[in-house]
Amino acid sequence: MDDRMIDGELQDQDVEIELSLRPSTLSQYIGQDKVKENLTIFIQAAKMREEPLDHVLLYGPPGLGKTTLASIISYEMGVQFRSTSGPAIERAGDLAAILSSLEPGDVLFIDEVHRLPRSVEEVLYAAMEDFFIDIVIGTGPSARSVRIDLPPFTLVGATTRAGLLSAPLRDRFGVLSRLEYYEIKDLCNIVERTADIFNMPISSEAAIEVARRSRGTPRIANRLLKRVRDISQVKGEEEISLESTKQALEMLQVDDAGLDHVDHKLLTGIIEGFSGGPVGLDTIAATIGEESQTIEEVYEPFLLQLGFIQRTPRGRVITSKAYDHLGIKRTGED
């Protein structure tokens, strides 16, 4: 799958900009008010007891700030931040090397925690619960188990697919926080903050337009703003205007609802090929030339959020809201 401008997953182009824009404290973090409120209390209580924070699971769609929140937790606790990902930890020995290097109270962030190999996950159970790991050294009759004691630490796991976590792993997290898609007003604040960091003021109307087409996702808002800034600077504007914003977003084929050409292809494919459904996921995938998993994990969540598509026992169905947005009449309508 090619990188999409409105894909919430982290892309190479995002890494540098996200590091420069990342807030360091909960007070600087915009949105997710309930999650922030809870974390503030939990962090304060842990610091009062002089204990590490309970293990934290952050879950929700990509691009909503899970990695940022993990780094903020370490900053607020006054400890070091270590970061890795589930696919990067292939063996129990890889995990042992990371855990044994932690200092007391450190935050270990594991992105895509649902992708940890089962053998690694089983080693993690004791590390999270009792702060030790057992490592088998050698093979055959001479093999022996060695116990390594670990300093108390906080594991922050992040996942876009909480349903794939095993129950034993999920139950070892003391704090579970779901990140939701952002409201327009919060995205506007993020866009204005980013524009300020870029030293390129933006009009309130332009900020609203970027926010409205960002699929409720800060990462997408910042990515779109970079391209809007390009147009505005080429035109010699001192402030990003609504006109330049609309021009840039039209060039990027991002419509008023935040849908791009791939979303349109998926929706119109079901409408034109299958009368709006119901139609099975594998059939849709074959029709538009994408993998079923990609459709289910990347394209569908926002379309479901908008109410443009429904999942039914018989397959996917396009809703009347989607027909109205696309300007297509249902078969049989006058």
UniProtKB/Swiss-Prot annotation:
Keyword annotations: ATP-binding, Cytoplasm, DNA damage, DNA recombination, DNA repair, DNA-binding, Hydrolase, Nucleotide-binding
Pfam family, one: RuvB_C
Positions bound to DNA: 311, 316
GO BP term, pick one: DNA recombination
Assigned GO CC terms: cytoplasm; Holliday junction resolvase complex
Top-tier EC class: hydrolase
Residue numbers binding Mg(2+): 67
Protein name (Swiss-Prot/TrEMBL): Holliday junction branch migration complex subunit RuvB
Source organism of the structure: Oceanobacillus iheyensis (strain DSM 14371 / CIP 107618 / JCM 11309 / KCTC 3954 / HTE831)
Lineage: Bacteria, Bacillati, Bacillota, Bacilli, Bacillales
Gene, per the UniProt record: ruvB
